[in-house]
């Protein structure tokens, strides 16, 4: 299933959870992702752990560290995606830092991603002006190349991003790093309208979305999807000594978020 098919199926706003591959270890990570799907996730965003995640706050940094300390490598991350594909066809997006792509080479990274079953790739620190290799590889292997749209993105730059993006726009709701926040800014709601008016791609909102009421506000403002990461990762961190409780709390949170979003599953 690609993103266009997913958005066409969803009634209301898509709910997309984000977790780090291999957090806290490979086997638990697979069960967490299975729980996300069972709870109704419309798509998945999977982060490849990185030692210097400059766009991420404390929760994701700690998740990256747990995954790396468990021995996760880029090869392991692709194997994790292959295991995910054994039990779900929902779109799987990668959120990575470009150094991981650069070290392997864009063509090889995207080839591996396509073979594993990846739908789209967002390199958090890759501006579209420098994305030639990634864009060529994405086109070659049939992967959507996704870029961040920030509150500071002006209309001219937004037009340029729209021309090279596919899949969806990843709209950053706030300036700064990832992490759960207490409210949705009014400027975010206005930004959704501006981005949707700039092109035909769906808009997914991430960074700081942590409560069902946030999801409902964003859905009402016209967001096509919401991406929730730190709030889920915090449940992983809180329950490292009790996997069953961890999975149950994650399931319950996703059900609440999914209900707030509205949807078909």
From Swiss-Prot:
Active site annotation, chain numbering: 45, 56
Catalytically driven reaction(s): (1S,2R)-1-C-(indol-3-yl)glycerol 3-phosphate + L-serine = D-glyceraldehyde 3-phosphate + L-tryptophan + H2O
Pfam families, sorted: Trp_syntA (PF00290)
Superkingdom to which the source organism belongs: Archaea
GO cellular component, one term: cytosol
Matches recorded under PROSITE patterns: TRP_SYNTHASE_ALPHA
EC assignment: 4.2.1.20
GO molecular function: tryptophan synthase activity
Record's keyword terms, sorted: Amino-acid biosynthesis, Aromatic amino acid biosynthesis, Lyase, Tryptophan biosynthesis
Pathway where this protein functions: Amino-acid biosynthesis; L-tryptophan biosynthesis; L-tryptophan from chorismate: step 5/5
Record-linked InterPro entries: Aldolase_TIM, RibuloseP-bd_barrel, Trp_synthase_alpha_AS, Trp_synthase_suA
Enzyme type, top EC level: lyase
Subunit description: Tetramer of two alpha and two beta chains.
Function: The alpha subunit is responsible for the aldol cleavage of indoleglycerol phosphate to indole and glyceraldehyde 3-phosphate.
Record family assignment: Belongs to the TrpA family.
Protein name, entry field: Tryptophan synthase alpha chain
Organism, scientific name: Methanothermobacter marburgensis (strain ATCC BAA-927 / DSM 2133 / JCM 14651 / NBRC 100331 / OCM 82 / Marburg) (Methanobacterium thermoautotrophicum)
Taxonomic lineage: Archaea, Methanobacteriati, Methanobacteriota, Methanomada group, Methanobacteria
